[in-house]
Amino acid sequence: MNKNLIIPKDKIADFCERHHIRRLAVFGSALRADFSAQSDVDILVEFQPGSEPGFGFFDMQNELSNLLARNVELHTPNFLSRYFRDAILSEAEVQYVQS
């Protein structure tokens, strides 16, 4: 994880519990040296079985943007391009796992 990105673990855990997320991970430039003040944060979420946020997904993205004080691009494994999915899943750094 890039030192310029601070992930407040307690707030992320609260966010995930409220939104029925079983796993949240960061991927992309936030893990590399090219991450800058202008970079957004790519976040991958997996929901608990039977939990689908619908249009609330965009509200969640905005909430995470406010929480991290950066633009957030929220993704789910099924929305990732099949051409990049395996690479993203293998590089992603998990920040929350439902206990």
Positions of PLM-derived features:
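Conserved G/P- and acidic residue-centered "switch" motifs that form tight phosphate/ATP-binding loops
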Residues: G28, D42
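Short hydrophobic/aromatic beta-strand micro-patches
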Residues: L44-E46
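Catalytic core of pol beta-like nucleotidyltransferases
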Residues: M1-A25, L31-A37, Q48-S99
